[in-house]
């Protein structure tokens, strides 16, 4: 069931982020075959800024999430390709996020490739279309100029704002980065919506 949802919603995620697929969407059976037989399924897409984003969905029992050397080789070879990489998104079964050898490789690859955003997330972030969940308030990234205008009007500094992690599900779907600002519309008893601004901070992983 998780794989079926991942297959459905990862493409909705790419569309929501306004990315363009660089290959045709594959049938579900091929997706499953790749995840379980090869160990991962890869989607390549292009951003509005013409940067390349590669999404890797790893099988829960594949060699890449259990053997650090295989993960290191995969990421190194990917980033050595002659492409203008903007982001790598690694999607894994939640227990993998507790494996130190895998997380150490993520840290290592970030240090070696400072211009590329490399993030690792659990399956469940992509097993539902987060922006369509009615219980979650509307989130929207705002520009630095809009944020500075708000801060100036309220006589605030960025550190005065409440924070939100870059790994928060709505922020992940928006593509928010540490240092960005997100506007959240919450229901209000005195108005249609109460608008709050949050400062995005680095995630723990």
From Swiss-Prot:
GO terms for biological process: transcription by RNA polymerase II; transcription elongation by RNA polymerase I; tRNA transcription by RNA polymerase III; viral transcription. It comes from the Viruses. SUPFAM superfamilies: RPB5-like RNA polymerase subunit. GO terms for cellular component: DNA-directed RNA polymerase complex; host cell cytoplasm; virion component. InterPro entries: Arch_Rpo5/euc_Rpb5, RNA_pol_subH/Rpb5_C, RPB5-like_sf. Keywords: DNA-directed RNA polymerase, Host cytoplasm, Transcription, Viral transcription, Virion. Part of the viral DNA-directed RNA polymerase that consists of 8 polII-like subunits (RPB1, RPB2, RPB3, RPB5, RPB6, RPB7, RPB9, RPB10), a capping enzyme and a termination factor. Belongs to the archaeal RpoH/eukaryotic RPB5 RNA polymerase subunit family. Component of the DNA-directed RNA polymerase (RNAP) that catalyzes the transcription in the cytoplasm of viral DNA into RNA using the four ribonucleoside triphosphates as substrates. This is DNA-directed RNA polymerase RPB5 homolog. It comes from African swine fever virus (isolate Tick/Malawi/Lil 20-1/1983).
């Amino acid at each position: 069931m998780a794989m079926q949802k991942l297959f459905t919603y990862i493409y909705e995620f790419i569309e929501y982020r306004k990315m363009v697929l660089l290959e045709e969407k594959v049938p579900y059976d091929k997706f499953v075959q790749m995840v379980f037989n090869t160990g991962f399924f890869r989607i390549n897409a292009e951003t509005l800024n013409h940067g390349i984003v590669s999404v890797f969905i790893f099988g829960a029992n594949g060699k890449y999430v259990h053997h650090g050397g295989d993960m290191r080789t995969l990421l190194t070879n990917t980033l050595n390709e002659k492409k203008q990489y903007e982001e790598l998104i690694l999607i894994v079964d939640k227990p993998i996020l507790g494996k130190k050898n895998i997380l150490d490789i993520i840290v290592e690859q970030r240090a070696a490739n400072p211009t590329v955003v490399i993030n690792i997330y659990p399956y469940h972030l992509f097993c539902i279309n987060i922006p369509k969940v009615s219980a979650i308030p509307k989130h929207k990234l705002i520009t630095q100029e809009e944020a500075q205008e708000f801060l100036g009007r309220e006589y605030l500094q960025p550190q005065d704002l409440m924070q939100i992690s870059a790994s928060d599900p709505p922020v992940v779907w928006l593509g928010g980065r540490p240092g960005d600002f997100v506007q959240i519309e919450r229901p209000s008893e005195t108005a249609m919506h109460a608008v709050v601004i949050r400062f995005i901070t680095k995630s723990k992983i």
